[in-house]
């Protein structure tokens, strides 16, 4: 491991300790940051990296760390600042200039490439927490108690973001951002249909597996121009809140805002394996029998082959809990090393195969990998998707 990587790990650990001493973190969260310091990868800029570099106070970094604990997407997703206050405009090449075979004394006509501008909008995701003043006063560490109460609201932010990243459709919900599924919604009749692979499911319990190569030049998250990692926290102070019966009580409020979006600069760097029949997968029968041409292991290999260059960014598979579980089981059944479960990376012990190192209770587990590409879990990937054709 390079010296710079060691220094980054030490710095991240020190940040956790400093935030703990300032009262911004409870001990459990601080320990997660110290453990998480061992997980950094050079060459990729995720939301936490941006937050740490742009907000020296540590407040935004703390929020991002909490988001990162319960959303595996943020672990690898690369982010960049949009070039618009409300989104990001990308110029996409739609055609190449023509070339001709020239003869002697024959002129060459001028030619140019064709380009199109695509604007990806950013959505504003908000939530607020209200904690009874007396409940706060009962706890010695008031700020830590408020932060712990706010974690449920941050989890709501997490789930909404993950759901929108895959299924957001601005034609139906204009206040959100455009997700991946509407962009990769057809196998035939669309230019990017070559990157939509069917697993053969025809019932009502279908899901999708996604392969995404994160990079500012391929696919990445965006946040508004001039903002700090898109996440804001405002302490609303003490005010009158209302219960279910519209009766007043004094509360301490917090407002959380996450301005975020998604831009696809090059559609070739995402592949959707759709129509994965969950019943067949669990039973290892039908479309998901080991001998079937539509078995997900075979289709994941095909998905990787559709990517022009796996080194163009950070490649990651995303699947729901059931799919990831079956891949972990396959890793134990197979003698070859196509699928593997990485061992724990430090002395804190192991949890169930497929768990994300550094999350949960502060102990580290293995990461499921397919041909070296990590497989991340996302519970927001539905198991009742409509059949894609």
Model-identified regions with their sequence ranges:
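Intrinsically disordered, low-complexity terminal tails
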Residues: 1-49, 383-389
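Core alpha/beta structural scaffold of self-assembling particle/tube/pore-forming proteins
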Residues: 38-67, 71-75, 87-91, 101, ...
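Primarily extracytoplasmic ectodomains and periplasmic/lumenal surface modules that are beta-strand-rich
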Residues: 96-99
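Active-site-surrounding "flap" and adjacent substrate/cofactor-binding loops of secreted or lumenal enzymes
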Residues: 106-110
